[in-house]
Structures are given as structure tokens and as C-alpha cells.
Swiss-Prot record:
Name of the featured protein: Serine--tRNA ligase
Pathway note: Aminoacyl-tRNA biosynthesis; selenocysteinyl-tRNA(Sec) biosynthesis; L-seryl-tRNA(Sec) from L-serine and tRNA(Sec): step 1/1
Protein family according to the UniProt entry: Belongs to the class-II aminoacyl-tRNA synthetase family. Type-1 seryl-tRNA synthetase subfamily.
InterPro entries linked to this entry: aa-tRNA-synt_IIb (IPR002314), aa-tRNA-synth_II (IPR006195), aa-tRNA-synth_II/BPL/LPL (IPR045864), Ser-tRNA-ligase_type_1 (IPR002317), Ser-tRNA-synth_1_N (IPR015866), SerRS_1_N_sf (IPR042103), SerRS_core (IPR033729), tRNA-bd_arm (IPR010978)
Protein role: Catalyzes the attachment of serine to tRNA(Ser). Is also able to aminoacylate tRNA(Sec) with serine, to form the misacylated tRNA L-seryl-tRNA(Sec), which will be further converted into selenocysteinyl-tRNA(Sec).
Domain notes: Consists of two distinct domains, a catalytic core and a N-terminal extension that is involved in tRNA binding.
Species, as recorded: Dictyoglomus thermophilum (strain ATCC 35947 / DSM 3960 / H-6-12)
UniProt record, GO biological process: selenocysteine biosynthetic process; seryl-tRNA aminoacylation
């Protein structure tokens, strides 16, 4: 949520922010929000005055007798009724104000590139050499079916379209990838979590999980206030709701493992086939809570950890700085890692990392107390350590052989005990 004081002092900054994010200015009426804020403050001032008058009269009632006392009692009753009336109006305005504030996106980082959509994202780095095949490379789905690693047909029969079974060596790869992530991040001081797969909607809303477009919506559990989480960012972010942390304990570095559920309504096209865009997948999520002055450094740190994992896997990738018009509401700045995917002959997103500054902390009321005594909102950041479905695509396609077999990345071989997956069909 946005600090109303900042909005009050510089409304034009938010108006520009909305335009730069390629959002509809009519949906985010900053001037109306400020009108509500002014009404609320005016009502608060009036209420304070009336309550002071009521308190003064209440004190006088005990000192007076007869008609004078009765007159004061009437005045006190009139004031009470007026106060109750204004409190109802205040509550109504405050509720609308906070709803409007809740909908505003985070302020952009000055370093976030300006642009309209994903076409304006900026490539800032490449790593690794793209392999030249002496044959036409298959895509991951053909390879997975050839090697009996997935079953979409039975997944669809049991659960519905875009659900699947991971099988055989693909299961070993999932656990090996998680083990690689643990062995990479544990020495960095990360605490490990397996989080719930469900969260209250107030937590989901507090995190501000509002992906762009219709492609990633939350599954709601009917007749409850629960939703299936789309990322462990939600459950890790809610872990310290309504808490005041100690400055000396920051940064908090968490690594959370969870299933992720996304309806992915509207997702279609050849790039979305197979494992690229599915309703359920497993993921390890990096989550850091830090002081405001440290968040930019922590953002670069998360990116470096994500890079380290894909470098260990020896998969070529590029790093993309996401432009203003392609950012989700909570992120002030975001980096994506896109791995080379030979099956599509292009890069595809495998990780992201976002600096959400104090946006989520304000919504979830997570603060810290400095050693000097001041209490402030923390900054919160998140990043993908590994998303199994996307990582499998990159491994299968980059490590395929002409006969359809798959070499196991060297770094994963000790976890699995084999060096190659051989076709079974």
C-alpha cells in the first residue's frame, strides 16, 4: 500500500507512475483519493473538537444542579448523537479511501526502464554459449513423452487440462534440483521452509499478487476465505504479518518450498504448450526482509544467486530488466532470467526477482525497530530459486541427444546416480 503522506505531497508522481506502468488512469483516480483523504482529515478534526466539547460538558455536569444540569445533559446528548453520525460518515470515507489506496501500484524505482510492454524490456547480460545441434532439436514435450517423463493425458483425465504427472527420472530431477538449491543457499545463511499451499485471502491480497493480464489468477476455495497459493512469496510474506522485527535480526533470508497453483486462464499458443504454463508446479522461492537502505543491494544479491544456480546447471541464459509497463503492481523493479530453449529457438523465462520496497510491508503491517528506537516499515524482496517445470524444459531441451536421450547436467549427477536418461518408447 502507498504511504498517503507521500501521495499527498507529490500526487503528480503517482499519476506519472500509473501512466508509465501502462495502467488506465481512469481506474486509479489520484485526485479523488486526495479528496477522500481531505474529507477524512476534516471529519477527524471536527470529531476531535466535538469530543473535547463533550468531555468538558461531562465534567461540568457533576458540578451543576437543577435546570443548569439538565441543560448540560441535553447538550451532551446532542453532541453524542452528532459524534455518532460523524463517526459513521468517517468510517465510510476511511473504508473507501483505504480501498482506493489498496488498489494503487507501488512507486517505480528510478532505475526501472521505461516502456509499454514486454517488447520494451532491456537485456542487460548474457551467460553461456548456445549449443549448435547437428540435428533438428525436439521441444521438451516431445522429449518428455519419448522418455516417459510426463503424462498429460492421464493428468487431464484425473484433474483436468494442463495438469500432469511427473514420472520416472523427471521425479529424480525435481528432487535433485531442490537439493542443488539447498546446497547453494544454505551456506548463504538462508532458513528453510516448507510452506502451506493455502493462504487466507487477506494474505494473498496483502502480498498484492496481481499478475498482468488474465494468465495467472488465484484458485479460491469455495465457502472459505482461503486460496491456493500461486507462489511461496505469499506464505513467506505473510509469515511476519503484524510484527515488529529487530533491526539487528535483519536481513531475514528465507527459502521456501511449495506447490504453486495458477488458473492460467487465457494462456495459449505454441510457447505455452507442455510444461511452460501449467496449473500446478513445484517451486523454491527466495524471500528477503531487510532495512530500506539495503533493498537495492539485496535485489542484486538475489539475482546473483539465481544466476549461480543456472551457471551450475550450465544452461545459457540472459538477464532482462523488466520495463515499467510490464511490471506487476507490487514491484518497484524486477529482473527476469530467461534460459535458452532450443525447442522454441528462443529464450524463455525461468526465474524472476522483484524489489517490492515497503509496498507489501505496509499492506501486511510488517515493521522493524531501529537500535535508535524508531519504528519503520521493512522492505521485502522475492525471487525464484528454481521453478521445476521451467527448469525441466531448459534441461531437457539443452541436454538432448540426437536419439532423444537426455544427458544429466554434471552438477545433478551425484544427486541422481545416473548420467543419462534413455528413451523408453
Amino acid at each position: 500500500m502507498i504511504d498517503i503522506k507521500v501521495l499527498r505531497e507529490n500526487p503528480e508522481l503517482m499519476k506519472e507512475n500509473i501512466v508509465l506502468r501502462n495502467l488506465d488512469p481512469n481506474k486509479y483516480d489520484v485526485d479523488y483519493i486526495l479528496e477522500l483523504d481531505a474529507k477524512r482529515r476534516s471529519l477527524q478534526k471536527e470529531l476531535d473538537t466535538l469530543k473535547a466539547q463533550r468531555n468538558k460538558i461531562s465534567q461540568e455536569i457533576g458540578k451543576r444542579k437543577g435546570e443548569e444540569r439538565e441543560e448540560l445533559i441535553k447538550k451532551a446528548k446532542t453532541l453524542k448523537e452528532k459524534i455518532e453520525e460523524l463517526e459513521k460518515e468517517y468510517e465510510k470515507i476511511e473504508k473507501e479511501l483505504y480501498l482506493k489506496l489498496w488498489q494503487l501500484p507501488n512507486f517505480l524505482s528510478p532505475k526501472a526502464p521505461k516502456g509499454k510492454d514486454e517488447k520494451d524490456n532491456i537485456e542487460i547480460k548474457r551467460w553461456g554459449n548456445i549449443k549448435t545441434f547437428t540435428f533438428t532439436p525436439k521441444d521438451h514435450l516431445d522429449l518428455a513423452l519419448l522418455n516417459d517423463l510426463v503424462d498429460f493425458e492421464r493428468g487431464s483425465k484425473v484433474t483436468g487440462s494442463n495438469f500432469y504427472y511427473l514420472k520416472n527420472e523427471a521425479v529424480l530431477l525435481e528432487f535433485a534440483l531442490f537439493r542443488l538449491v539447498i546446497d547453494t543457499l544454505l551456506p548463504e545463511g538462508f532458513k528453510l521452509f516448507i510452506t502451506p499451499d493455502l493462504a487466507r485471502m487477506e494474505i494473498i491480497d496483502g502480498i498484492g499478487f496481481q499478475p498482468r493480464g488474465p494468465e495467472a489468477q488465484i484458485y479460491r476455495v469455495e465457502d472459505t476465505d482461503l486460496g491456493l497459493i500461486a507462489t511461496a512469496e505469499i506464505t513467506l510474506g505473510g509469515y511476519h504479518k503484524d510484527e515488529i522485527l529487530d533491526e539487528l535480526d535483519l536481513p531475514l533470508k528465507y527459502l521456501g518450498f511449495s506447490h504453486c497453483f495458477r488458473t492460467e486462464a487465457g494462456a495459449y499458443g505454441r510457447y505455452n504448450r507442455g510444461l511452460y504454463r501449467v496449473h500446478q508446479f513445484s517451486k523454491a522461492e527466495i524471500f528477503i526482509i531487510c532495512r530500506p537502505e539495503d533493498s537495492e543491494e539485496m535485489h542484486e544479491y538475489i539475482l546473483s544467486l539465481e544466476e549461480k544456480i543456472f551457471q551450475k546447471l550450465e544452461i545459457p541464459y540472459r538477464v532482462v530488466d523488466i520495463c515499467s509497463g510490464d511490471l506487476g503492481a507490487p514491484a518497484a523493479r524486477k529482473f527476469d532470467i530467461e534460459a535458452w530453449m532450443p525447442g522454441r529457438g528462443d529464450f524463455g523465462e525461468v526465474t524472476s526477482c522483484s524489489n517490492c520496497t515497503d509496498y507489501q510491508a505496509r499492506r501486511l503491517n510488517i515493521r522493524f525497530r531501529r537500535v535508535t528506537g524508531e519504528v519503520e516499515y521493512v522492505h521485502m524482496l522475492n525471487g525464484t530459486a528454481i521453478a521445476i517445470s521451467r527448469a525441466l524444459i531448459a534441461i531437457l531441451e539443452n541436454y538432448q541427444q540426437e536419439d532423444g536421450s537426455i544427458l544429466i547436467p554434471k552438477v545433478l549427477q551425484p544427486y541422481i546416480g545416473i548420467s543419462e536418461i534413455k528413451p523408453k518408447k
